């Protein structure tokens, strides 16, 4: 497994790096990537941006808005949260078991004394 840690806080750069890793490694290698963004709203592939954000607030506060290549809901990022990406070689039958990606992270956090737990499909709550 490859491990990458992005030094960039630029959300466009980090999403491009994520896509580059996916395109270059493809089905050959697994990769775990850690990254942070400056103040950003990341919207899912199929979301209507204007329905997901308060454009006046976003402009007034200098918040960047970017779209990721995958689906899912809109999320807010800033330097107070750490994002992780798994690029995995194989999904059994095309089905993704998100808990298999979250479980090692939760286990590592618990070993450090952080009371983490998995909620829902892919949410880690602390």
Language model features with spans:
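Short coil/turn connectors at secondary-structure junctions
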Residues: 27-31, 37-39, 60-63, 79-81, ...
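Catalytic micro-motifs at enzyme active sites that drive phosphoryl/nucleotidyl and oxygen chemistry
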Residues: 70-74, 114, 120-122
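Residues forming anionic-ligand binding surfaces in small-molecule and nucleic-acid pockets
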Residues: 69-89
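General beta-strand structural signal in soluble alpha/beta enzymes
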Residues: 5, 34, 65-67, 116-120
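Active-site loop/lid in soluble adenylation, ligation, and acyl-transfer enzymes
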Residues: 1-52, 56
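Active-site cofactor/substrate anionic-group-binding motifs, chiefly glycine-
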Residues: 52-74
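Conserved small/polar residues in nucleotide/adenosyl-binding loops
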Residues: 124-126
């Amino acid at each position: 497994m490859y491990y990458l840690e992005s030094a960039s806080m630029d959300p466009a750069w980090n999403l491009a790096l994520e896509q580059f890793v996916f395109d270059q490694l493809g089905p050959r290698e697994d990769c775990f990537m850690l990254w942070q963004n400056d103040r950003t709203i990341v919207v899912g592939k199929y979301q209507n941006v204007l329905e997901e954000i308060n454009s006046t607030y976003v402009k007034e506060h200098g918040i960047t808005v970017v779209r990721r290549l995958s689906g899912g809901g809109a999320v807010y990022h800033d330097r107070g949260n750490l994002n992780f990406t798994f690029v995995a070689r194989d999904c059994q039958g095309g089905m993704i078991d998100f808990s298999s990606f979250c479980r090692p992270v939760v286990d590592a956090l618990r070993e450090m004394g952080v009371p983490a737990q998995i909620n829902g499909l892919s949410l880690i709550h602390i």
